[in-house]
UniProtKB/Swiss-Prot annotation:
PANTHER family: 5'-NUCLEOTIDASE SURE, 5'_3'-NUCLEOTIDASE SURE. It catalyses: a ribonucleoside 5'-phosphate + H2O = a ribonucleoside + phosphate. It comes from Treponema pallidum (strain Nichols). Nucleotidase that shows phosphatase activity on nucleoside 5'-monophosphates. This is 5'-nucleotidase SurE. The keyword Lipid biosynthesis does not apply. The gene is surE.
Length: 187
Protein backbone atom coordinates (compact mmCIF):
# COMPACT_ATOMS: atom_id res chain seq x y z
CA UNK A 1 0.00 0.00 0.00
CA UNK A 2 1.33 3.41 -1.01
CA UNK A 3 0.68 6.15 1.55
CA UNK A 4 1.08 9.88 1.09
CA UNK A 5 1.56 11.51 4.48
CA UNK A 6 0.95 15.23 5.02
CA UNK A 7 -0.31 17.66 7.66
CA UNK A 8 -0.78 21.35 8.39
CA UNK A 9 1.76 21.64 11.24
CA UNK A 10 4.83 21.25 9.02
CA UNK A 11 7.09 18.36 8.04
CA UNK A 12 9.14 18.68 11.25
CA UNK A 13 6.13 18.52 13.62
CA UNK A 14 6.10 15.79 16.25
CA UNK A 15 2.76 14.37 15.09
CA UNK A 16 3.78 13.67 11.49
CA UNK A 17 7.16 12.34 12.64
CA UNK A 18 5.47 9.86 15.02
CA UNK A 19 3.01 8.76 12.34
CA UNK A 20 5.78 8.39 9.74
CA UNK A 21 7.81 6.23 12.13
CA UNK A 22 4.80 4.02 12.98
CA UNK A 23 3.85 3.53 9.32
CA UNK A 24 7.45 2.72 8.32
CA UNK A 25 7.77 0.25 11.22
CA UNK A 26 4.50 -1.55 10.42
CA UNK A 27 4.98 -5.17 9.36
CA UNK A 28 2.80 -4.59 6.28
CA UNK A 29 5.71 -2.83 4.56
CA UNK A 30 3.89 0.35 3.58
CA UNK A 31 5.53 2.59 1.00
CA UNK A 32 5.36 6.01 2.70
CA UNK A 33 6.08 9.37 1.09
CA UNK A 34 5.87 12.60 3.09
CA UNK A 35 4.99 15.89 1.40
CA UNK A 36 4.19 18.45 4.09
CA UNK A 37 4.40 22.21 4.57
CA UNK A 38 7.78 23.79 5.25
CA UNK A 39 6.24 25.58 8.26
CA UNK A 40 3.07 25.62 10.35
CA UNK A 41 0.03 26.16 8.12
CA UNK A 42 -2.68 25.51 10.72
CA UNK A 43 -6.22 26.73 10.07
CA UNK A 44 -5.69 27.56 6.38
CA UNK A 45 -8.77 25.54 5.46
CA UNK A 46 -8.86 24.41 1.82
CA UNK A 47 -6.64 27.26 0.67
CA UNK A 48 -4.43 26.98 -2.38
CA UNK A 49 -1.52 29.17 -3.36
CA UNK A 50 -2.18 31.18 -6.52
CA UNK A 51 -0.03 34.33 -6.46
CA UNK A 52 3.41 32.83 -5.88
CA UNK A 53 5.27 29.68 -6.93
CA UNK A 54 4.85 26.54 -4.84
CA UNK A 55 8.11 24.66 -4.46
CA UNK A 56 8.94 21.23 -3.08
CA UNK A 57 12.33 19.94 -2.05
CA UNK A 58 13.45 16.61 -0.68
CA UNK A 59 14.87 17.27 2.80
CA UNK A 60 15.43 13.60 3.70
CA UNK A 61 14.94 10.45 1.65
CA UNK A 62 11.19 10.18 1.03
CA UNK A 63 10.40 13.40 2.94
CA UNK A 64 9.53 16.51 0.95
CA UNK A 65 9.01 20.03 2.24
CA UNK A 66 6.47 22.19 0.38
CA UNK A 67 6.22 25.99 0.45
CA UNK A 68 2.42 25.88 0.17
CA UNK A 69 -0.69 24.88 2.08
CA UNK A 70 -1.70 21.30 2.94
CA UNK A 71 -3.87 21.22 -0.21
CA UNK A 72 -0.88 22.44 -2.23
CA UNK A 73 1.11 19.57 -0.69
CA UNK A 74 -1.40 17.00 -1.96
CA UNK A 75 -1.51 18.64 -5.38
CA UNK A 76 2.30 18.82 -5.69
CA UNK A 77 2.71 15.27 -4.45
CA UNK A 78 0.35 13.96 -7.12
CA UNK A 79 1.74 16.13 -9.93
CA UNK A 80 5.44 16.10 -9.09
CA UNK A 81 6.58 13.67 -6.39
CA UNK A 82 4.36 10.60 -6.86
CA UNK A 83 4.02 10.75 -10.65
CA UNK A 84 3.38 7.25 -12.02
CA UNK A 85 2.91 5.77 -8.54
CA UNK A 86 -0.08 7.57 -6.99
CA UNK A 87 -0.87 6.84 -3.36
CA UNK A 88 -3.64 4.45 -2.36
CA UNK A 89 -4.44 6.70 0.58
CA UNK A 90 -3.56 10.17 1.84
CA UNK A 91 -3.15 10.37 5.61
CA UNK A 92 -3.05 13.86 7.09
CA UNK A 93 -1.76 14.37 10.63
CA UNK A 94 -1.31 13.75 13.37
CA UNK A 95 -2.57 17.24 14.15
CA UNK A 96 -1.85 18.73 17.55
CA UNK A 97 -5.37 19.71 18.59
CA UNK A 98 -8.80 18.36 17.77
CA UNK A 99 -10.74 18.86 14.54
CA UNK A 100 -14.35 18.37 15.59
CA UNK A 101 -17.73 19.71 14.46
CA UNK A 102 -17.62 22.82 12.33
CA UNK A 103 -13.90 23.26 13.14
CA UNK A 104 -13.23 20.90 10.23
CA UNK A 105 -14.13 23.78 7.89
CA UNK A 106 -11.00 25.67 9.02
CA UNK A 107 -8.65 22.72 9.38
CA UNK A 108 -5.75 22.33 6.98
CA UNK A 109 -5.36 18.78 8.27
CA UNK A 110 -8.89 17.85 7.21
CA UNK A 111 -8.57 19.85 3.97
CA UNK A 112 -5.65 17.69 2.82
CA UNK A 113 -7.74 14.53 3.33
CA UNK A 114 -10.66 16.21 1.57
CA UNK A 115 -8.41 17.09 -1.39
CA UNK A 116 -7.42 13.43 -1.68
CA UNK A 117 -11.08 12.41 -1.83
CA UNK A 118 -11.65 15.01 -4.54
CA UNK A 119 -8.98 13.18 -6.58
CA UNK A 120 -10.67 9.82 -5.94
CA UNK A 121 -8.05 8.75 -3.38
CA UNK A 122 -8.98 7.60 0.12
CA UNK A 123 -8.49 10.40 2.66
CA UNK A 124 -7.83 10.10 6.39
CA UNK A 125 -7.28 12.97 8.84
CA UNK A 126 -5.95 12.25 12.34
CA UNK A 127 -5.96 14.72 15.23
CA UNK A 128 -5.04 14.47 18.88
CA UNK A 129 -6.51 16.34 21.82
CA UNK A 130 -3.65 17.35 24.12
CA UNK A 131 -3.49 16.25 27.72
CA UNK A 132 -3.98 19.32 29.87
CA UNK A 133 -3.06 17.64 33.15
CA UNK A 134 0.31 18.93 34.33
CA UNK A 135 1.09 20.41 30.89
CA UNK A 136 2.13 17.11 29.36
CA UNK A 137 0.96 18.07 25.86
CA UNK A 138 0.37 15.49 23.14
CA UNK A 139 1.53 11.90 23.23
CA UNK A 140 1.38 10.94 19.57
CA UNK A 141 2.73 7.37 19.64
CA UNK A 142 -0.48 5.52 20.58
CA UNK A 143 -2.56 7.22 17.88
CA UNK A 144 0.27 6.74 15.37
CA UNK A 145 0.32 3.00 16.14
CA UNK A 146 -3.51 2.86 15.89
CA UNK A 147 -3.51 4.50 12.46
CA UNK A 148 -0.64 2.30 11.21
CA UNK A 149 -2.39 -0.85 12.44
CA UNK A 150 -5.77 0.08 10.90
CA UNK A 151 -4.88 2.20 7.85
CA UNK A 152 -6.30 -0.32 5.36
CA UNK A 153 -9.63 -0.55 7.18
CA UNK A 154 -9.78 3.22 7.64
CA UNK A 155 -9.04 3.78 3.94
CA UNK A 156 -11.85 1.38 3.06
CA UNK A 157 -14.27 3.67 4.94
CA UNK A 158 -13.39 6.58 2.64
CA UNK A 159 -15.29 6.97 -0.63
CA UNK A 160 -15.92 9.50 -3.40
CA UNK A 161 -17.74 11.78 -0.95
CA UNK A 162 -16.49 10.59 2.45
CA UNK A 163 -13.24 11.24 4.27
CA UNK A 164 -12.32 9.68 7.58
CA UNK A 165 -11.66 12.16 10.40
CA UNK A 166 -10.09 10.60 13.52
CA UNK A 167 -9.97 12.48 16.81
CA UNK A 168 -8.50 10.96 19.96
CA UNK A 169 -7.29 12.02 23.37
CA UNK A 170 -3.64 11.59 24.25
CA UNK A 171 -3.32 8.15 25.81
CA UNK A 172 -0.92 5.25 26.17
CA UNK A 173 -3.21 2.96 24.12
CA UNK A 174 -6.77 2.76 22.80
CA UNK A 175 -9.19 0.02 23.79
CA UNK A 176 -11.93 0.82 21.28
CA UNK A 177 -13.13 3.23 18.62
CA UNK A 178 -16.57 4.52 17.71
CA UNK A 179 -18.03 6.17 14.63
CA UNK A 180 -19.92 9.44 14.58
CA UNK A 181 -21.22 11.81 11.94
CA UNK A 182 -20.07 15.43 11.83
CA UNK A 183 -22.33 17.63 13.93
CA UNK A 184 -22.45 21.37 14.43
CA UNK A 185 -21.05 22.85 17.61
CA UNK A 186 -24.53 24.18 18.43
CA UNK A 187 -25.71 20.80 19.67
Amino acid sequence: MRILLTNDDGYQAAGIRALHAALKAAPEGYEVTVVAPDRDRSAVSHGITTLEPVTVKEVEPGIWSCSGTPVDCVNRALRQVCVGTPPDVVVSGINEGENLGTDIVFSGTVAAARQAVMYGIAGIAASLLPVSDFGTGCRFQALARFVARHVRALAALSSEDVLVNINARSAQAYARACYARVASSDI
